[in-house]
Amino acid sequence: MEGWQRAFVLHGRPYSETSLLLDLFSESDGRVRVLAKGARARRSSLKGCLQPFTPLLVRWSGRGEVKTLRSAEPVSLALPLTGSMLYSGLYVNELLARVLEHETNYSALFFDYLHCLQHLAAQDASPEPALRRFELALLGYLGYGVDFLHCAGSGEPVADTMTYQYREERGFTASLVVDNKSFTGHELHSLASREFPDVGTLKAAKRFTRIALKPYLGGKPLKSRELFRQFVPAANLSKPTSSDK
């Protein structure tokens, strides 16, 4: 790769005694795996900056699947994520590491990711709206096109008071059936606008994104969800702001 580009570390693990194997999310090349040689050495200048949520400028080289990291510089301090916001950030990172194609440009998604982290770092009352907006944006970039505003059967605009059944590869059709794949027209309007004014629309958005992301994630559970369940105090798990992602 010629020149520098912006990137974040999605995930890293030790490689040999002194190196790190990193999954990066870069502005121009999307998800890239790099080997950071000597990054774990005691005197390495990279030791402190190759952490999740730290905005970086990076350069790498190589033609294989694993590149060699040549340089990395922090653009600023790491975004301050703590508590449920930290686990939410880890969830977003794991999601990207699992579903993004290798070395594919997602430059617009890069900024959606940055905005999501900034919202989480602002320590708002709940991470849920930012997570749902990001998931919906991600689905769009993955090619998961859904028309939330029209009935797939009739083509008519959805009505707030009617119920619609979601069917994969078809969209939403008017239905009297009420189950996990049923959504009101009011909820569909919220999904289309990515604005969630109440608990009901937030829960509906979570149901939809879980249904839609399942084919991309397969049967393997997300580790960040399990970490959240293990380490967040049980009292918080019942609160809307601390529900598993």
Swiss-Prot record:
The keyword Ubl conjugation does not apply. Disulfide bonds: none annotated. One of its GO terms (biological process) is double-strand break repair. InterPro entries: ARFGAP/RecO, DNA_rep/recomb_RecO_N, NA-bd_OB-fold, RecO, RecO_C. Pfam families: RecO_C (PF02565), RecO_N (PF11967). Keywords: DNA damage, DNA recombination, DNA repair. SUPFAM superfamilies: ArfGap/RecO-like zinc finger (SSF57863), Nucleic acid-binding proteins (SSF50249). One of its GO terms (cellular component) is bacterial nucleoid. The keyword 4Fe-4S does not apply. Gene3D superfamilies: Nucleic acid-binding proteins, Recombination protein O, C-terminal domain. PANTHER family: DNA REPAIR PROTEIN RECO. Belongs to the RecO family. Involved in DNA repair and RecF pathway recombination. HAMAP family: RecO. This is DNA repair protein RecO. It comes from Pectobacterium atrosepticum (strain SCRI 1043 / ATCC BAA-672) (Erwinia carotovora subsp. atroseptica). The gene is recO.
